[in-house]
């Protein structure tokens, strides 16, 4: 029994939702999202409450039930409050700047790294901290992971790009022979 799928999703007044066949349409004043659901899941929208039910009793239907419940909940949260991830850049000479539709990273390579900012993503740079904001949870996480992958933190000095809440397990360096 899916505990995630059982939840009833309350849709706030700032978000409008509608069901068209197997499609769920969500929109607020700025943007809209569409969720195509599988035919093994039944969608019910009544009084700004969204619920899902599995069509069959097999494991596949129950898996889709929880998955689409979580995806719809993420879209509603994204359109009402939004998602954000914070990255920190640590290292001597490592710099971050916001260019015209690009994020310019100086990470110790022989060339600067220019990352194009995708549509629907907003970035704020303060000193060596990057804040990524957006309404799509998957896209925000993917952009943060791609930026981190340019220079992941290394365990000896902790240099690199890391999530703000990430804990780097440090290693001791070599010890000299006696």
Swiss-Prot record:
Alphabetical keyword list: Ribonucleoprotein, Ribosomal protein, RNA-binding, rRNA-binding
Gene name as annotated: rplF
Any GO molecular function: rRNA binding
Subunit structure: Part of the 50S ribosomal subunit.
Family (UniProt): Belongs to the universal ribosomal protein uL6 family.
Transmembrane helix in keyword set: no
CC annotations in GO: cytosolic large ribosomal subunit
Keyword Kinase listed: no
UniProt function note: This protein binds to the 23S rRNA, and is important in its secondary structure. It is located near the subunit interface in the base of the L7/L12 stalk, and near the tRNA binding site of the peptidyltransferase center.
Name of this protein: Large ribosomal subunit protein uL6
Short name of any one Pfam family annotated for the protein: Ribosomal_L6
Biological processes, Gene Ontology terms: cytoplasmic translation
């Amino acid at each position: 029994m899916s505990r995630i799928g059982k939840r009833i999703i309350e849709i706030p007044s700032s978000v409008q939702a509608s069901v068209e066949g197997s499609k769920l349409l969500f929109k607020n004043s700025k943007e809209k999202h569409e969720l195509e659901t599988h035919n093994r899941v039944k969608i019910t929208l009544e009084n700004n409450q969204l619920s899902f039910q599995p069509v069959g009793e097999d494991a596949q239907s129950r898996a889709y039930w929880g998955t689409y419940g979580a995806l719809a909940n993420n879209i509603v949260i994204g359109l009402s409050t939004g998602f954000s991830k914070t990255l920190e850049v640590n290292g001597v000479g490592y710099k971050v700047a916001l260019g015209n539709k690009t994020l310019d990273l100086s990470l110790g390579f022989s060339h600067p790294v220019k990352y194009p900012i995708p549509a629907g993503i907003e970035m704020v740079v303060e000193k060596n901290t990057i804040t990524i904001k957006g309404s799509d949870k998957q896209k925000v996480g993917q952009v943060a992971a791609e930026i981190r992958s340019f220079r992941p933190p290394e365990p000896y000095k902790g240099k690199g790009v890391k999530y703000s809440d990430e804990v780097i397990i440090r290693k001791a360096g070599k010890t000299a022979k006696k």
